[in-house]
A protein has these predicted regions:
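Short glycine/proline- and acidic residue-enriched helix-loop micro-motifs
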Residues: 102-133
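Glycine-rich phosphate-binding loop signature in dinucleotide/nucleotide-binding domains
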Residues: 43-45, 145-154
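Short beta-strand scaffold positions
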Residues: 51-52, 136, 157-159
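An N-terminal RHG(E/S)-centered segment typical of histidine phosphatases
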Residues: 1-46, 54-55, 62, 70, ...
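Active-site metal-coordination segments of metallo-dependent hydrolases
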Residues: 20-29, 122-132, 179
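Phosphate-coordination/substrate-recognition cap region in phosphate-metabolizing enzymes
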Residues: 37-112, 182, 197
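Acidic, low-complexity terminal tails and accessory targeting/binding regions
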Residues: 84-102, 151-153, 165-211
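Generic beta-sheet signal
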Residues: 3, 151-162
Length: 211
């Protein structure tokens, strides 16, 4: 199995999602980075593409798929790939948009696009998600990947820096996920060799700059 990991491009109000002010749209920079990422990946042949069920994560995915020469791949949305504290964030966003006395004209679209599979916001905890809980999500994702998909598959994961770092740490057999945190629209690539994973590249951002 070969696994390529990347992250979505920068999204609007990226620095204050915990306040419920974030939008599901990519920023201009995020769109540009996603387009350059798509150009870098256009010749790749993927069997499966996994992404989070947030709107902006799916936007980067759609831009990548649109640019692929070989489009015979399956896109799978997976809540395990959400960013840390995502449910708390989206609950606050929904409350802010619903209770606002002057609703934003795009409120309904934003709410419906926060989740691709469902527009139902799940019950959330009032406390921050722990690193152990994020680790469990990463382990659950990898367990499903290894047990439900062919070992000969080439897989693209469009996650976020935190969840990707936990996934990479698991592949590398490391307990220190912080050393594997990556940049938006970067590329990290791993190939299975027997019982271990060979790192082919990590946090590569060369494709984001004009050559």
């Amino acid at each position: 199995m070969r696994i390529i990991l990347t992250c979505n491009g920068e999204y609007i109000n990226a620095h204050c999602p915990s306040l419920g002010h974030c939008n599901d749209r990519l920023s201009e920079k995020g769109i540009l980075s996603s387009l350059r990422l798509a150009k870098e990946l256009k010749n790749q042949i993927f069997d499966y593409i996994f992404c989070s069920d947030f709107g902006y994560r799916r936007t980067t995915t759609d831009l990548i798929v649109e640019g692929l020469i070989y489009k015979n791949c399956k896109i799978i949305v997976d809540a395990n790939l959400r960013e840390k504290d995502a449910e708390i964030c989206t609950q606050k966003i929904k409350e802010n948009l619903t209770q606002s006395s002057d609703p934003h004209p795009e409120s309904s679209q934003i709410i419906s696009r926060l989740f691709i599979k469902s527009d139902i916001v799940p019950t959330t905890k009032n406390t921050s998600e722990s690193s152990e809980q994020v680790l469990i999500r990463a382990q659950n994702f990898l367990h499903q990947l290894f047990h439900n998909y062919p070992s000969s598959s080439t897989v693209l994961i469009i996650g976020n820096p935190i969840i990707n770092s936990f996934i990479i740490a698991q592949l590398r057999g490391s307990s220190n996920f912080t050393q594997y945190i990556t940049s938006p629209c970067s590329l990290s690539e791993y190939e299975q060799k027997g019982n271990s994973w060979q790192q082919l590249r990590f946090n590569d951002i060369s494709h984001l700059y004009l050559k």
